[in-house]
Amino acid sequence: MSVKPSAQTNDTIQSTSKSVPAASDSLVIGDAIYHLADHTPMMVQYLTMKANYPQALLLYRMGDFYELFFDDAKRAAQILDITLTRRGTDKAGNTIAMAGVPFHAADSYMARLIAAGQTVVVCEQIDESATGNARNTSNTPTMGDKQKKDKSKSAAGTIMRREVVKTLTAGTITDDALIAPNHTPTVVAIDILIPKSNSKQSLQAAISQMDLAAGTLTTQTLSANHDDIEGLKTQMLTVLARFAPSECIIGEALNDSIGGIGEDWLLWLRQSLDCPIIEVAANDFHRQHASATLCQQFGVQRLDGLGSGISDAPLAQSSCAALIHYARQTQQRQVPQINQLIVEYSDDYLIIDANSQQNLELFTPVSSNGTSLLSVLNHCQTPMGRRLLVQQMKRPLRQHSRINLRLDAIACLLKTDKTSIESNQASNQALKHSSLVISLREMLNSIGDIERISSRIGLMSAKPRDLRKLADGIASSTQLTTLLTDSGVSHEQAGLLPMLMQQLPAQLPAVQSIAKLIERAIITEPPAHIRDGGMLAAGYDDEFDRLTHLHDNIQVTLDEMVERARLESQLPSLKVGFNKVSGFYFELPKMQAKNAPAHFIRRQTLKSSERFITDELKDVETEYLSAQTLALTREKQLYHELLTELSSHLAELQQLSAAIAQIDVLSNWAQLAMTYNWQCPVMSNNDENKDSSNTDNQASIDISQGRHVVVEAALNPVNAGNAGNTVNSSNNSSNNSGTTRHNSHFVANDCALGSDANPERLLLITGPNMGGKSTYMRQTALIVLLAHCGSFVPAASAHIGDIDRIFTRIGSADDLAGGKSTFMVEMIETANILNQATNQSLVLMDEVGRGTATTDGLAIAHACVNRLLEIGCLTLFATHYFELTKLAQNPKESSGSNDKLIRNVHVAASEVDGQLLLLHQIKEGAASSSFGLHVAKMAGIPTQVLNDAKRYLVDNLTIDNLGIDNLSIDNLKSNNESANDDKNDLAKSVKDKRQQTADSDIEKLNLSNIKKTQNMTDIPQQNQLFSLQDELHAIDPDSLTPKQAHDLIYHLKKIISR
């Protein structure tokens, strides 16, 4: 979910409130009044159903089509780009607009309507005869024309019975054909308690999420001071960013005591969310009835029995109850698969708000051709695993014991692989067949979406192919146990992998019985749908077998019957036949007809023969003519009973699905670790040593040779492919922790804050544009995120302390629709950080203060640094305001009490032959220059413009013009030292024959910087020192006579004394 400021259009707002008749002979639906007397019985039936769903699109089944009428037809035609026609007029002469879609291709049309934010209500024909004629693929006799006419006459004058069978919404769909790839439909319900104006009671809100496919309800209660509405909204947006709902339901804005949201809050939600917002009946949120609804759903007497903390959270109860009501309404049945309730708290997870998620490009890239972190990481083999990985990234853990469980499991997989690889290398076996991780992933790739199939079983909507996929998945998951056991992992051991093995079929007899039942019931390649039958296997049911045998083998049955009659009656010329008028008959020649048995009933006399029928033959005829219908009815009944039986084991199926998903994610993390040479992080401040009430528990990070996941993968696409397939053996060597370059030539860098060796809380990062400051900051945040997800990290080593949130202020964007400039947007993000950050937060601030006057920008940046120091959070602060570097060199400049809170670092860069060379290395000290003109040249700025810029910089730009403090000589010396350090690094990377030239160029560059700085100061003492330096630089000592040298010394001493 993305949070956006623009208002939501009313077209996406759906309502389930029912219309009521305006009078006994008319209906009000929306803004229209329909007089029932003007319409045919069929249209009256349609309008009566439509009145219950005024804002939804009603798909009304008529034969082979789903039809839409009136405004629904116009709306659907516009969205689907289909023909808008008409179904004549009513008796008053009003045109009835109509549009339709074929029922056999309806899924694709429904998916498009749902994606457009519409609610789709499906109305089906219930009569069996309405589903079309039964199939007849043989050349055997069919029902006579006279019988068809008689049957059709019996139905004449009646209206086909129809019922609403399901309501499809963006958050409650479970059919794969309706769900976009890699998308998880969810619904959130929001309940808010606003205290009275004279009350000191805190503001409260509960946000609950329902994942119908996973069968989970997740809820979190938020609170803020009674007058801090903006604070509560900020918290809500953070939770909504984590939930990423497909739709949101709220109670109608009625009585707050019942549970409703005021119009102001509703408007704010519409402006903030990019999903449909649906108003439901306020009683669905009724706080007095919520407890009973939850107890009924979860089968407990009291909410205390759930043991999840829900009993003390009335708003969480009401919002969860509203979701259960909504699920039952949309699915038109009970929802037994919702059997897990999770209560979340802010301290459970590392919090990353929506802005930070976007700035770090976790799930979606900023640019259309960009790459998100998820796209690089997500190479899971099962649909459940891919969804679980997203959830783990949205919910990075803070509890170190849970993190270490995941890390230990990954280490176990890698350790097993390493042992196996060494053993197989010694025996000269192929590497690709020795890896446990690869074997697991190959097996996982054959497992279908058990989670969603289980959900559809609970909703009685699973299709025959779903069941076959389930049986095949169970068989494959059994092999997972074998692979792990053969690698030395036992379900009796401690750890996450043994726990997961206990949820695999080997330890769940009920799951094994499910697979056997499906194998016995469903054919190997069943049809896609049950409507035409043909999915049950022979031998599953005797009665079904008899009916299908009768229909499919009618000639055999007749042949057996006539042969038996010949023997019994001694009539060798007896034959059996069929015609459309009389049906089945026995036929005897005239000469033998007089010997016909008594039970033969004469039916027809021909010139040379007589035709007879018997009661047995009539029974066979009746059974045959109805056999296909009876077989299809019996097959559907048996299939329904099969789903009912399977639904009694939903809990075991959900356990299996969850275990497979976790194994998939763990093997995915292990594959990434092998491919990219990631290392296991060390999570410090373990839970047992942590005092949660102690606010002095400060965060810390100590990362050695860290890399940026996405950039490294982009620079090395071969490895990126291997991450999703096989192990890259070149990366299985020992860790090269001493180097700053890897296969992809990505330059690795250290980052340490708050550690024993580096106690500083803020890194002030300077350096040129394009040098890698933003990449360095982002990679630090991503390493911290991955560690809290329980993954190995792209670094030689990483020690991560107790971090509660990650904030970022990176990049630039405006909000034209919301009336906010780029600078305003950046200030809002900065304000959020300064108001929400704690001493356990990690904060990334990039170029704060740009976009306004330099004096204002520098002042804002200076104040922000001081505020961040007061908070004590870990901060990476990138800036081009070199004046800020004095805060680290002169601690008294800052308002902090600690003299070692700030450390200057810079991105190394140097100039060679007039060209800027970016080394991408983080070095101690402040940068000597931002090299803005060099970057402008690289971007293609015309030479004339660059020369003009240089002249302006040298001749006109002075510190006095800017109205800010002057650079100190000490700062200048530091800058020169940094430049010399970068020069030394550069000399190592260029050819020997150019080293002397490069040194000369860099020395000239430093002198140029000194002269530029001379022009940028107006302090007399500093001017005199620069003048003295110029004189010394101009002197040639070898050309001076002793007298001239003596006079020069007195001259210099006189200048210094002044």
Swiss-Prot record:
It comes from Psychrobacter arcticus (strain DSM 17307 / VKM B-2377 / 273-4). Pfam families: MutS_I, MutS_II, MutS_III, MutS_IV, MutS_V. Residues 980-999 have a biased composition (Basic and acidic residues). Residues 720-740 have a biased composition (Low complexity). SMART domains: MUTSac (SM00534), MUTSd (SM00533). Keywords: ATP-binding, DNA damage, DNA repair, DNA-binding, Nucleotide-binding. It comes from the Bacteria. The lineage of its organism: Bacteria, Pseudomonadati, Pseudomonadota, Gammaproteobacteria, Moraxellales. Residues 130-142 have a biased composition (Polar residues). Residues 130-156, 720-742, 975-999 are annotated as: Disordered. One of its GO terms (biological process) is mismatch repair. ATP binds at G767, P768, N769, M770, G771, G772, K773, S774. This is DNA mismatch repair protein MutS. Transmembrane segments: none annotated. Disulfide bonds: none annotated. Belongs to the DNA mismatch repair MutS family.
